[in-house]
Amino acid sequence: MMKAEELNKGFVNEIIEAGTPVPGEKEVASLKSCYQCGTCTGSCPSGRRTAYRTRKVIRQALLGIDSVLDSDDIWKCTTCYTCYERCPRDVKVTEIIKTIRNLAAQKGNMAKPHKMTAVYVLKAGHAVPANDDTAKLRKSIGLAEKAPIAQFSQKDMDELRTLAKNLKFDELIGFDWKTMGLKQ
């Protein structure tokens, strides 16, 4: 059981401050309107198949339990926005979860599948890069092996990689430029 002195009394305000530039203060400040009815959890497709409970994440944030930033649960949200649409208090749950994820990532906590998506973008310019199987399938149905919009030009890739380096996104995800993968 947690003790009162272990709670971060300013955590809600940290979340609101972090979310003020994007998605916006109003959206993230809606966190304070949550009265824990559970509509978000009952609506959540991830919650039906995993131990993920949206309401629990929101409750931890409201109580100042900043260890939520270390939790794998925050990465189980699919950002489908069902909770967002169904909340009777108009709490922008998905935007709050994304803001909490951003805080966790800044702290160095990010789910490996999310890091791998970023790796694919830095390697190929696309979160789901074309591979040999995709090329064969496209060819078998009479399409060009490479979709013209699915891959970036070398100039575009250079700009993307420069941007990632300048913003230290590569460091955030632990990207190794030599292996073009995650650092071991």
Swiss-Prot record:
Per its UniProt record, what SUPFAM superfamilies does this chain match?
A: alpha-helical ferredoxin
Give the highest taxon in the source lineage: Archaea
Pathway membership of this protein? Cofactor metabolism; coenzyme M-coenzyme B heterodisulfide reduction; coenzyme B and coenzyme M from coenzyme M-coenzyme B heterodisulfide: step 1/1
Cofactor detail note: Binds 2 [4Fe-4S] cluster.
Required co-factor? [4Fe-4S] cluster
What are the recorded Gene Ontology BP terms?
methanogenesis
Residues bound to [4Fe-4S] cluster 1: C34, C37, C40, C87
Annotated catalysed reactions = coenzyme B + coenzyme M + 2 reduced [2Fe-2S]-[ferredoxin] + 2 H(+) = coenzyme M-coenzyme B heterodisulfide + 2 H2 + 2 oxidized [2Fe-2S]-[ferredoxin]; coenzyme B + coenzyme M + 2 reduced [2Fe-2S]-[ferredoxin] + 2 CO2 = coenzyme M-coenzyme B heterodisulfide + 2 formate + 2 oxidized [2Fe-2S]-[ferredoxin]
**Molecular-function GO term, any one:** 4 iron, 4 sulfur cluster binding
Recorded hits in Pfam families, A to Z, give: Fer4_8
Look up the record and report any one GO term of the cellular component aspect.
plasma membrane
Mind telling me which InterPro entries this protein's record contains? 4Fe4S_Fe-S-bd, 4Fe4S_Fe_S_CS, CoB/CoM_hetero-S_Rdtase_csu, HdrC_iron-sulfur_subunit, Helical_ferredxn
Query: According to the UniProt entry, where is the signal peptide?
Result: none
Subunit arrangement? Answer: The heterodisulfide reductase is composed of three subunits; HdrA, HdrB and HdrC. B1 and B2 subunits are interchangeable, as are the C1 and C2 subunits. The heterodisulfide reductase forms a supercomplex with formylmethanofuran dehydrogenase (Fwd), F(420)-non-reducing hydrogenase (Vhu) and formate dehydrogenase (Fdh).
User: What family is this protein classified in?
Assistant: Belongs to the HdrC family.
Q: What does this protein do?
A: Part of a complex that catalyzes the reversible reduction of CoM-S-S-CoB to the thiol-coenzymes H-S-CoM (coenzyme M) and H-S-CoB (coenzyme B).
Record-given protein name: H(2)/formate:CoB-CoM heterodisulfide,ferredoxin reductase subunit C2
Origin species, per record, is: Methanococcus maripaludis (strain DSM 14266 / JCM 13030 / NBRC 101832 / S2 / LL)
